[in-house]
Amino acid sequence: MKLFDYAPLSLAWREFLQSEFKKPYFLEIEKRYLEALKSPKTIFPKSSNLFYALNLTPPSAVKIILLGQDPYHSTYLENEQELPVAMGLSFSVEKNAPIPPSLKNIFKELHANLGVPVPCCGDLSAWAKRGMLLLNAILSVEKNQAASHQYIGWEAFSDQILMRLFKTTAPLIVVLLGKVAQKKIALIPKNKHIIITAPHPSPLSRGFLGSGVFSSVQKAYREVYRKDFDFSL
């Protein structure tokens, strides 16, 4: 079986990325990911959500990109069942999962900047449906092992996704939180898209709270689309 048998990808993205899927680097990603999936190890997010960020936001609908590093590797209990926190969207968690510290800080800053009520759950899929691509640079992870799937090679694929999007004519608003995400600035054509940077929202990082990052995003969105982005959840 092929990757897309385990991890569905929408027709719009298959057409947009068609030439990538036969390249040696992608065939190697497919091989390594399927090997990990078939091993005794537990892989997050579940394979059906591997491309959830892409499936919720078609290429033609992307207006904002909020880049993450890799999926949450932790679990939570629901009805005595251990479930993955990760759901395939950067920073987002399953509806009934506890809100992680980084996401709590995102909600705090969003409220401080724009007065958006702090939501009771951490599912950001509504943002994705409104045109915010919530893409992780690395798409999978082993349970309880942060950054364990760097070896798979996902970043080569996510870089291609970004570079293809950056070739579009409409200005994109690219939000890069933290030094790792900000390395992607090198991929972005100069003077074509709007780049907004801030420290990582992790409590271990300093400077995110009070950065005004969401005020900057909203200002840029108004300039490009003549309306506000709806951050409500």
From Swiss-Prot:
Which compartments is it annotated to reside in?
Cytoplasm
**GO cellular component: a single term:** cytoplasm
Is Cytoplasm among this UniProt entry's keywords?
A: yes
List the GO biological process terms.
base-excision repair, AP site formation via deaminated base removal
One GO MF annotation is: uracil DNA N-glycosylase activity
Provide this UniProt record's keywords sorted from A to Z: Cytoplasm, DNA damage, DNA repair, Hydrolase
What is the species listed in this Swiss-Prot or TrEMBL entry? Helicobacter pylori (strain G27)
Family classification = Belongs to the uracil-DNA glycosylase (UDG) superfamily. UNG family.
Q: What is its EC number?
A: 3.2.2.27
TM regions (residue ranges): none
User: What does the record give as the active site?
Assistant: 70
Q: Which InterPro entries match?
A: UDG_fam1, Ura-DNA_Glyclase_AS, Uracil-DNA_glycosylase-like, Uracil-DNA_glycosylase-like_sf
Q: What does this protein do?
A: Excises uracil residues from the DNA which can arise as a result of misincorporation of dUMP residues by DNA polymerase or due to deamination of cytosine.
- This protein's source sits in the domain of life called Bacteria
Which catalytic reaction applies to this protein?
Hydrolyzes single-stranded DNA or mismatched double-stranded DNA and polynucleotides, releasing free uracil
Q: What is this protein called?
A: Uracil-DNA glycosylase
